[in-house]
């Protein structure tokens, strides 16, 4: 493939917003083995081009997403080879598709394709499919050689192993939570949106179900003790909505809260702490520092700071702090509740980030006692096609480089806590290598300075600056290639809001959404109305949550008696 073809295709798409070149661009990226980027771009406009649906299916296959790939395959079944012919799909990719999906010799066109490229090892391997049983085929040296380049091919040929998994619909609330998504009244809610998730042997778990964004509060209690895990707030259209914790406790006939444990320093997990002023409040030192910096209206009374792996004893109930990889200072809680083991994950991530290490699952598996209740987040539980955080990070850097190459300014609305520093570090090496410069502004600038000092890590400097308050807004826009600004949700009056007010009328602007923004946010609506005109817009999820595959695999590894999916919309079974 000609290098000039790639340059022209990238310019047309990333600079001129011309989607007609996407079929060619995805072909080029797939051949360059940029499978995550291929999938991402193909997914954007799959309804406009059948060839993009083909590359979405093929990239999912190579990435090992077998079920998602087969779901697309079944949409056109035996017609895929005709689609390849109609859209002139690159021959090598046609053969690879035929290998993954075990195609037969349906047409003269396909047979001629095989004949023309018989010197290719892909073709030679395909020719052997009908000569060997599947058991012998996967033992061929040529098959294993091809699998070195395409490891996921083995998954498509190996029979599914039956496993005696303890995770069944009878033991797991998957089915309940799946239904809950579609019909709000499938599980009873009281007037304060509290939901009884568990009631057995005198132990009860109630969880708050928020209006839109998932604010967390989970009450675990028995006849002798009540402990609350997280007490967050919701960002709603007209501001912040606090959880009515005191009223909820009164409705549940709870007179005393023995302790409150906060998993991490995001508003949806601590924003209603003022509702519980008398209870001892436990969190890590890093979480306490983050809350003090970002929320001056939160009063941390009765604060007790703990370190990773510390254990707190509350009336005979033991709660252990285990780092969980979401942001700096974040933890899950491993609870021994009078002989019952409960794990409350908070928000968690297995992948290492620049600013914190991922959850070490072995820290949970080495404890011999079986988990009775696994209370886990499910932010991405309804997105089985979702890629991993590392794959989205790769997509993010690739798109930034492509956009900047053609002279566009990039604005990245970002959460101040953790995400801004993480985004800056993702781009740091690329900025040095490609010569573009980055400005961090708003509360994100203060938090990035805090992260730099607390981590002793070089974030600021070189090609990355933080705004110090003495430079005109227009000057900042004109003299920086990338601007990272809070708030991540584009709230009116925020730093990111003011930047976009100025930038949306410019000719070459790219908005990169890397976290949650409410659909009704006026600025987001303005951005989307200009999309594919003067504004380029990409939505690349970089929040450090457990992806769908992780949610399933972690549950299977922990093998609890009961798994409850919270803080999201359940999980797609």
Labelled PLM ranges:
Residues 32, 63, 101-103, 134:
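Structural motif corresponding to the intra-repeat A-B loop/turn of tetratricopeptide repeats
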Residues 174-176, 180, 184, 190, ...:
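C-terminal regulatory/interaction regions
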Residues 397-512, 566:
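Hard-cation-handling environments
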């Amino acid at each position: 493939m000609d290098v000039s073809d790639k340059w022209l295709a990238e310019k047309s798409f990333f600079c001129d917003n011309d989607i007609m070149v996407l079929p060619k661009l995805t072909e080029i990226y797939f051949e360059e083995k940029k499978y995550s980027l291929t999938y991402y771009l193909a997914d954007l406009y799959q309804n406009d081009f059948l060839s993009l649906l083909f590359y979405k299916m093929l990239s999912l296959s190579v990435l090992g997403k077998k079920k998602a790939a087969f779901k697309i395959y079944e949409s056109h079944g035996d017609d895929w080879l005709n689609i390849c012919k109609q859209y002139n799909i690159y021959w090598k990719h046609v053969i690879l598709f035929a290998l993954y999906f075990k195609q037969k010799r349906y047409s003269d066109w396909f047979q001629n394709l095989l004949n023309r490229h018989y010197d290719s090892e892909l073709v030679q391997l395909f020719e052997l499919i009908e000569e060997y049983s599947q058991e012998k085929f996967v033992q061929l040296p040529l098959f294993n050689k091809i699998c070195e380049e395409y490891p996921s091919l083995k998954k498509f040929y190996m029979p599914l192993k039956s496993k005696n998994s303890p995770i069944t619909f009878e033991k797991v609330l998957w089915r309940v939570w799946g239904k809950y998504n579609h019909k709000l009244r499938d599980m009873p809610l009281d007037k304060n949106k509290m939901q009884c998730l568990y009631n057995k042997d005198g132990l009860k778990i109630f969880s708050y179900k928020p209006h839109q964004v998932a604010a967390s509060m989970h009450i675990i209690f028995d006849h002798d003790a009540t402990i609350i895990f997280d007490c967050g707030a919701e960002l709603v259209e007209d501001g912040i909505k606090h959880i009515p914790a005191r009223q909820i406790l009164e409705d549940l006939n709870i007179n005393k809260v023995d302790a409150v444990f906060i998993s991490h320093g995001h508003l949806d997990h601590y924003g209603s702490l003022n509702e519980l002023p008398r209870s001892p409040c436990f969190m890590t030192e890093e979480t306490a520092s983050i809350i003090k910096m970002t929320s001056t209206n939160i009063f941390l009374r009765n604060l007790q700071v703990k370190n990773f792996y510390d254990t707190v004893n509350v009336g005979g109930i033991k709660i252990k702090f285990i780092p969980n990889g979401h942001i700096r200072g974040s933890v899950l809680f491993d609870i021994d509740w009078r002989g019952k083991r409960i794990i409350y994950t908070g928000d968690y991530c297995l992948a290492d980030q620049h600013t914190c290490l991922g959850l070490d699952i072995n820290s949970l598996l080495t404890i011999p006692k079986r988990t009775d209740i696994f209370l886990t987040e499910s932010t991405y539980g309804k997105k089985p096609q979702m890629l991993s955080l590392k794959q989205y990070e790769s997509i993010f850097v690739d798109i930034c480089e492509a956009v900047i190459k053609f002279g566009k300014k990039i604005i990245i609305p970002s959460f101040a806590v953790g995400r801004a520093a993480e985004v800056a570090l993702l781009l740091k090496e690329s900025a040095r290598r490609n010569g573009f410069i980055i400005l961090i502004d708003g509360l994100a600038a203060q938090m990035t300075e805090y992260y730099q000092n607390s981590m002793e890590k070089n974030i600021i400097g070189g090609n990355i600056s933080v705004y110090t308050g003495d430079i005109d807004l227009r000057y900042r826009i004109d003299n920086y290639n990338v601007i990272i600004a809070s708030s991540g949700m584009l709230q009116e009056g925020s730093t990111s809001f003011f930047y976009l007010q100025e930038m949306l009328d410019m000719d070459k602007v790219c908005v990169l959404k890397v976290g949650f923004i409410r659909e009704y946010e006026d600025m987001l609506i303005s951005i989307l109305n200009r999309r594919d005109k003067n504004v380029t817009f990409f939505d690349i999820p970089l929040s450090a949550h457990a992806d769908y595959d992780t949610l399933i695999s972690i549950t299977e590894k922990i093998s609890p008696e009961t798994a409850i999916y919270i803080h999201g919309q359940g999980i797609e079974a």
